[in-house]
């Protein structure tokens, strides 16, 4: 299923090298990793919510997520240091390419009233962040087994130095950016 990787190697990388006049092939921006994060405020009261989120993310990513814990105690949120408050998974290599392909060609087209992802979500260092409102966008999630709709953050980390280079990379891979 790594068609996206071959597309990158055969089409996107040479096009980027030409567009930005890179002298060395190692200067061409490439994907480093994709981080999927789910923050769960309700995990404080409901421990089963965390297990369900972990199972969902494991199904989507094909890799077991790590549970994230609170760094500080915050009394207004009723959390203490070390309490589980979410989960995240870092994808690299083949799994990263598989997930990106699934995100671009399956999950994003399923979003209601989808007009493209925001071109403003770059962080200034060539990384792209994107929020999804529900886990049902992915085909691995069975609608009948979902206890609660949860969103997730997807962070695409690239080796690009600027946002312009990162946008050209993602656009070349088929990321549907919204036109202003």
UniProtKB/Swiss-Prot annotation:
Naming one, the record's GO cellular component terms include: ribonucleoprotein complex
Subunit comment: Part of the 50S ribosomal subunit; part of the 5S rRNA/L5/L18/L25 subcomplex. Contacts the 5S rRNA and the P site tRNA. Forms a bridge to the 30S subunit in the 70S ribosome.
Lineage summary: Bacteria, Bacillati, Bacillota, Clostridia, Eubacteriales
List the coiled-coil residues: none
Its name, as the record gives it, is Large ribosomal subunit protein uL5
Q: Which GO terms describe its molecular function?
A: rRNA binding; structural constituent of ribosome; tRNA binding
UniProt lists the gene as rplE
Q: What SUPFAM superfamilies does the database record attribute to this sequence?
A: RL5-like (SSF55282)
Q: Which InterPro entries match?
A: Ribosomal_uL5, Ribosomal_uL5_bac-type, Ribosomal_uL5_C, Ribosomal_uL5_CS, Ribosomal_uL5_dom_sf, Ribosomal_uL5_N
Chain's role: This is one of the proteins that bind and probably mediate the attachment of the 5S RNA into the large ribosomal subunit, where it forms part of the central protuberance. In the 70S ribosome it contacts protein S13 of the 30S subunit (bridge B1b), connecting the 2 subunits; this bridge is implicated in subunit movement. Contacts the P site tRNA; the 5S rRNA and some of its associated proteins might help stabilize positioning of ribosome-bound tRNAs.
Q: Which organism is it from?
A: Symbiobacterium thermophilum (strain DSM 24528 / JCM 14929 / IAM 14863 / T)
Q: Name one GO biological process term.
A: translation
Keyword annotations from UniProtKB, A to Z: Ribonucleoprotein, Ribosomal protein, RNA-binding, rRNA-binding, tRNA-binding
Q: Which Pfam families match?
A: Ribosomal_L5, Ribosomal_L5_C
**UniProt family annotation:** Belongs to the universal ribosomal protein uL5 family.
